[in-house]
From Swiss-Prot:
Top-rank lineage group of the source organism: Eukaryota
Task performed by this protein: Associated with resistance against stem rust fungi.
Keywords carried by this UniProt record: Antimicrobial, Fungicide, Pathogenesis-related protein, Plant defense, Signal
Family label: Belongs to the thaumatin family.
GO BP term (any one): defense response to fungus
Keyword Transmembrane helix in record: no
SUPFAM superfamilies, alphabetized: Osmotin, thaumatin-like protein
CDD domains: TLP-P (cd09217)
Gene3D superfamilies per UniProt: Thaumatin
InterPro entries, per database record: Osmotin/thaumatin-like_sf, Thaumatin, Thaumatin_CS
Signal peptide (UniProt feature, chain positions): 1-21
Protein's recorded name: Thaumatin-like pathogenesis-related protein 1
Length: 169
């Protein structure tokens, strides 16, 4: 058993050594305030029109999601949003509906990313990585997005890449 644990630890250490954190640059080009949210990294914050902010995502993060919430009102971290609400919390621990989702996994030599409208569409979004394809989603029928769980809209990106998410591009 000790040998199995040592091998597993060594494999994880090698995987982690090849991966590094990714920076997600989030830009709000909408004519109104958007409240970006993210799980498991990012929580939630206010992003006024024409502003940008960065989120640092550690290597090894999988099943990550970032989305924009609209029509929000918060007081001491509690409130509500017209779209993308996550149980009335400013800092989200679950995703809200309806929302256009930027989904990602930050791996070792390769990352994966996509846009999903499975849970609904609320904001036009561009999502790109520094070494991959720019995904564009302007409406609920956008061809670059997942529309049902069996879609094949996931894209690969070189590991150690950074990302750009733009609301209302």
């Amino acid at each position: 058993m000790a040998t199995s644990s040592a091998v597993l630890f060594l494999l994880l250490a090698v995987f982690a050594a090849g991966a590094s954190a990714a920076t997600f640059r989030i830009t709000n080009n909408c004519g109104f305030t958007v409240w970006p949210a993210g799980i498991p990294v990012g929580g939630g914050f206010q992003l006024n029109s024409k502003q940008s902010s960065n989120i640092n995502v550690p290597a090894g993060t999988s099943a990550g999601r970032i989305w924009g919430r609209t029509g929000c009102s918060f007081n001491n971290g509690r409130g509500s949003c017209a779209t993308g609400d996550c149980a009335g919390a400013l800092s989200c621990t679950l995703s809200g509906q309806p929302a256009t989702l930027a989904e990602y996994t930050i791996g070792g030599s390769q990352d994966f990313y996509d846009i999903s409208v499975i849970d609904g569409f609320n904001l036009a979004m561009d999502f790109s990585c520094s070494t991959g394809v720019a995904l564009k989603c302007r409406d609920a029928n956008c061809p670059d997005a997942y529309h049902h769980p069996n879609d094949v809209a996931t894209h690969a990106c070189n590991g150690n890449s950074n990302y750009q998410i733009t609301f209302c591009p």
